[in-house]
């Protein structure tokens, strides 16, 4: 890591929404006034104690925060090395970390007088969280979801509809998260007056990457306090799965200036990081480009055309990554690795068998890397992994991958 870096890794983005060479605002002229107004409103809300009082009240009484920091004793014994702690964000209302951010954005939308909320979703968890909070506040909700993801995440589609949301299947491209985000942006341009776009990850044009990070940072803030209480010191290693990267950024951000804490993000390796791009590991196998309003690492061909990635995990099936992650990668503050579908499935089963926790396929990727490195680490080494979602939504996908019959026969 260069010696001449700024004293803090937590000062970004700059006034142009940049994290080094990444981020920014690459949007149409139609959207620019909306983006600038959103930035103004968020900058004001950030300094308004009443805004954060409402956030913390709802995090506590509606979401169920703080989420526990859990010592995975049997998993630690099975792996035979480092102590493994799980930050249990799958216990949040709606079953994932997504609601942490959704609450903040929708409180902001209400302050701005917006009556219609749109969102994109991959695994469906951001869509469910958005539909949930819209129902609580009586707002119209439209969720764009790739047609392929609608098929493989049917339980979450039904949940969104139960909550009153309109779910719009997106058939363009491969029908995944990238395509859903494209259509959501088109909707926003068309319905600028009454509509607020609630982005679910630390991507998109500024101020979204920083705003989503700030709302998700409650994960890492709690983990710091809980780890100090449990162990009397900070963890040695943080590990989290990365699609766009919001759960990881939420865990990592409060620890960025703790140089003794190693930070590892785990991308979706699909069938393996290869020239066929049968993966979604944009940092491992991509290069810089522009998508969805920000400059970051992307899966693309020689002509700069965005490629369709592949992952068994709908929530990680995105050909890019948040710009702050791209910056942390390039300056060496965080390390990024990839895990294949097969490795994630093994970790999914390991967690079920050892801890009685059914993880989502997204954190199963992080858990697979934990299982890979923990046995070779000393017993006093502490790993803190973000369990960012529960696996109810994935049981049909996992059953199919494992060749299990879900027809009801024992």
From Swiss-Prot:
InterPro entries: Trp_synth_b_CS (IPR006653), Trp_synth_beta (IPR006654), Trp_synth_beta/beta-like (IPR023026), TrpB-like_PALP (IPR001926), TrpB-like_PALP_sf (IPR036052). It catalyses: (1S,2R)-1-C-(indol-3-yl)glycerol 3-phosphate + L-serine = D-glyceraldehyde 3-phosphate + L-tryptophan + H2O. Keywords: Amino-acid biosynthesis, Aromatic amino acid biosynthesis, Lyase, Pyridoxal phosphate, Tryptophan biosynthesis. Its cofactor is pyridoxal 5'-phosphate. GO terms for cellular component: cytoplasm. It comes from the Bacteria. Pathway: Amino-acid biosynthesis; L-tryptophan biosynthesis; L-tryptophan from chorismate: step 5/5. The modification N6-(pyridoxal phosphate)lysine is found at residue 98. Its EC number is 4.2.1.20. The beta subunit is responsible for the synthesis of L-tryptophan from indole and L-serine. Tetramer of two alpha and two beta chains. This is Tryptophan synthase beta chain. It comes from Dinoroseobacter shibae (strain DSM 16493 / NCIMB 14021 / DFL 12).
């Amino acid at each position: 890591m260069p010696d001449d870096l700024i004293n803090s890794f937590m000062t970004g983005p700059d006034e142009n929404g940049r994290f080094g060479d990444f981020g920014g605002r690459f949007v149409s002229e139609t959207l620019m006034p909306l983006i600038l107004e959103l930035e103004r409103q968020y900058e004001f809300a950030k300094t308004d104690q009443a805004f954060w009082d409402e956030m913390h009240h709802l995090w506590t009484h509606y979401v169920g925060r703080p989420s526990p920091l859990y010592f995975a004793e049997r998993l630690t014994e099975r792996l035979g090395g480092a102590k493994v702690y799980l930050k249990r964000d799958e216990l949040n209302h709606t079953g994932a970390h997504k609601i942490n951010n959704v609450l903040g954005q929708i409180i902001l939308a209400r302050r701005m007088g917006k009556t219609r909320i749109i969102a994109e979703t991959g695994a469906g968890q951001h869509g469910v969280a958005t539909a949930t909070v819209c129902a609580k506040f009586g707002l119209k909700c439209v969720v764009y979801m790739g047609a392929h993801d609608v098929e493989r995440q049917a339980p979450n589609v039904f949940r969104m509809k139960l909550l009153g949301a309109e779910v719009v299947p997106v058939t363009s491209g491969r029908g995944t998260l990238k395509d859903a985000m494209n259509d959501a942006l088109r909707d926003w341009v068309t319905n600028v007056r009454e509509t607020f776009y609630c982005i679910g990850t630390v991507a998109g044009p500024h101020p979204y990457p920083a705003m989503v990070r700030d709302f998700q940072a409650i994960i890492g803030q709690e983990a710091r306090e809980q780890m100090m209480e449990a162990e009397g010191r900070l963890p040695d290693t943080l590990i989290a799965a990365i699609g766009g990267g919001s759960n990881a950024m939420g865990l990592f951000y409060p620890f960025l200036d703790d140089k003794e804490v190693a930070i590892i993000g785990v991308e979706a390796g699909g069938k393996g990081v290869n020239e066929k791009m049968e993966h979604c590991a944009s940092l491992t196998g991509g290069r810089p480009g522009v998508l969805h309003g920000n400059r970051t690492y992307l899966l693309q061909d020689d002509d700069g055309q965005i490629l369709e990635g592949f992952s068994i995990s709908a929530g990680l099936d995105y050909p890019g990554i948040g710009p702050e992650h791209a910056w942390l990668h390039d300056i060496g503050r965080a390390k990024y690795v990839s895990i294949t579908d097969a490795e994630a499935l093994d970790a999914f089963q390991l967690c079920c068998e050892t801890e009685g926790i059914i993880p989502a396929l997204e954190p199963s990727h992080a858990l697979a890397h934990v299982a890979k490195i923990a046995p070779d680490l000393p017993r006093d080494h502490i790993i803190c992994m973000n369990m960012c979602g529960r696996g109810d939504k994935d049981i049909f996908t996992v059953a199919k991958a494992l060749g299990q019959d879900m027809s009801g026969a024992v």
